[in-house]
Amino acid sequence: MYEILNRINGPEDVKKLSLGELETLSAEIREALFNRLTKIGGHFGPNFGIVEAEIAMHYVFSSPKDKFVFDVSHQSYTHKILTGRKAGYIDDARFSEDSGYTNPAESEHDLFNVGHTSTSISLATGLCKARELQNGKWNVIALIGDGSLSGGEALEGLNVAGSEIRSNLIIIVNDNQQSISETHGGLYKNLEELRNSDGKSEHNIFKDFGLDYIYEKNGNDIGSLIEVFKKVKDIDRPTVVHINTLKGKGYERAVADKETWHWTVPFNRETGEKLVAGGRNYVSVTREYILNKAEKDDKFVVVTPNMPMCVGLSPADRVKLGEQFVDVGIAEEQAVAMASGMAKGGVKPLVITNATFMQRAYDQISHDVCINGNHVTILLNNSAFDGLTDVTHLGIFALPIFTNIPDLTVLSPTTEKEFTGMLDWALDVHTGASVILIPGGKILNRPRADGFDGAMKYEIEQSGEKVAIIALGDFDQKGESLAEAVEAELGFKPTLINPRVATLVDKQTLDDLKKNHKVVVTLEDGVLSGGFGEKIAAYLGDSDLKVKNYGLNKVFYDRYKPAELLKELGITNESIINDVKKYL
C-alpha cells in the first residue's frame, strides 16, 4: 500500500523521486490520511486538497534550512508525513505521537506552534527581518489559505511584506475557494477575478501591496507546482504564488460538501457515515434557540467570524436567517466591533464562535463594547475543560480573560433551561454586555429552579453545614458528586452552590456561610489564576473560613486526557475530602 511512502524518511528522500513516483506518493499519502482520519478524525478537506503542493514544496526547497511557516497549520499533515512522522498516519498505535498542528517539539521542520488563522505572513516577515540582520541566505515560505486572508493580521502582514521586506519571501496562497464555511468579503471576490483571468486581472490586491505575483491554475498538479516553485526559489523580493486547489480532492463527498468535511470525527470511508453518536446536545439546543428567536424578533441578528457550525447553523439555516445572519469571515475583531455598532443602532447582536478564538477580540470587547456600555451578547463554545485540548485551542483561559473586564457579565449555565434562560435575559432584559459559556458534555435534567431570571445571586442547590461547595459551570456535576461523597464519608450534608454568574461575588450568600461552615471549596473548569475561585478567596480572606480553590494551573496544556489531569491536580473526591478533613 505504501511502496513509495515507505522509502520516505525525510525531505531528502522526496528529492530523489521521479515525477511519476511523486504522483504515486501523493496517492499513498491520501491513503495514509484516510487511515488516520477515519479512525480518530481531524482536518480532512484542507489536507486532502494540499497534498501535491506540500510534496512540491519539499521537492524544491530544503527544509529545515529553508523556513516553512504554515498558517493555522491544520493543513500540515502531508508536511509531517514527509518530515519523519509518517508513523503517526500509517501506524494506528502511534497516532498520539503526532498532533494536528505544527509543533517544534515534534520536529525541527516545524517552526511554530500554530492553531489560529492569519499569523503566517506576520511570522514570516519576522523571520525575513532576522535573516536580513544576520546576512543569511535561505528561503522563507509562508503557506496561507482556507479563509485566513480575511483576518486582519494577514492584511497587516501583506502590508509590511510589501513595504519593509527587501529580500526573499514567498507567500503561497492556497486558494480552495473555501474557509471553514464559505468565504466572505471583497478580498475573495478579487481572488475569484484572478482565478477567472488566469491571474491577469488588472485588479490585484497583492500587487497593490507592492508584491510580485504569479498565478498557477493547476494547484493539484505536482509537475506544474514544481516548475512555479523553482521560478521563485531564491528570489530576492517578496512574491505571492497564488495556487488554485480543490479542497477535499480524493474523496467525492468532501469535494461535494466542503464545509461538512473541513473537519470530521471518525467516519466510515465507504458510506461517509460519522462514527460518533449524534443526538441532542447543547449545539443543537443553541441552533434551535437561534432559529426560533430570529423568527420572533426582527431586531435579533447573529454575527460570526466564520464559525456558524460551532452552533450547528447549516447553510440552509443561514439562508433562512437572511439579513439576520452576518458572517464577517475569520475576523473576530470585526465581528465584535460590528456587533457593538449594531447595538448602538438599536438591534440585538449575538456573536458566536469558539472560546479560543475570541481572545483575539479582547480589545474590542473591552474598548468598543464595554467602555461604551453597548448591549452585545457573546456566545462561546468549547470553553469547557473537556472540550478542545490542543495547546493552541484551549478554552480554559476564558474565565480569567473575560471575568476581569469591567461591565461585562459572564454567565456559566449548567442546564438547558438555565442556558436558554440566560440567553433570554442577556438579549431581552439586560442592557449591557454579556458572555455566555455554552455548557459542554451531555444535557442533564436536574430538579432545580427553571431558567434564569437575572437575579445576581447564587443558587443554593442544597443547604447543609460545615463544608460549602461552590461549583461553577461544567464543574457543577463534580460538585454534586463531591457533595454526595462528603455526606457518605464524613456523615453530614454539605452546602452545594451553583454560582451561575462567573463575574459575581454574592456577598450575602458568602456572609451567610460564615454562620455554620468551616470550609469553602470552589470548583471551576478553567485556569485558577485570575479566575472565579480567587475572587471568592479574596472576599473571605479576613474571615475564619478556610477557602480551597480547585481548577487548572496557568499552563499551556497540550492534548491532555481530562481524567488524568484532574487526578494530577487533585480534583477528585478522595483528594478534596482529604484536604477538607484538615480544617474540620
For each of these PLM feature ranges, what is it?
Residues 40-42, 66-69, 113, 136-151, ...:
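A short, small-residue-rich loop immediately preceding and capping a beta-strand
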Residues 43-164, 300, 305, 314-315:
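Cofactor-binding active-site loop characterized by glycine-rich and histidine/acidic residues
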Residues 89-98, 163-176, 370-382:
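A glycine-rich helix N-cap at a beta->alpha junction
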Residues 274-276, 387-389, 400, 409, ...:
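Peripheral docking tails and interdomain loops at the edges
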Residues 110-267, 273-279, 283-288, 408-517:
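Glycine-rich ThDP/TPP pyrophosphate-binding loop and its adjacent helix/strand module
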Residues 67, 251-358, 364-374, 471-473:
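Non-catalytic terminal/interface segments that mediate subunit docking, oligomerization
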Residues 1-81, 218, 222:
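N-terminal amphipathic, basic-rich helices that act as targeting or association modules
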Residues 31-38, 97-113, 135-141, 315-326, ...:
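Glycine/charged-rich beta-loop-alpha catalytic/anionic-binding loops adjacent to active sites
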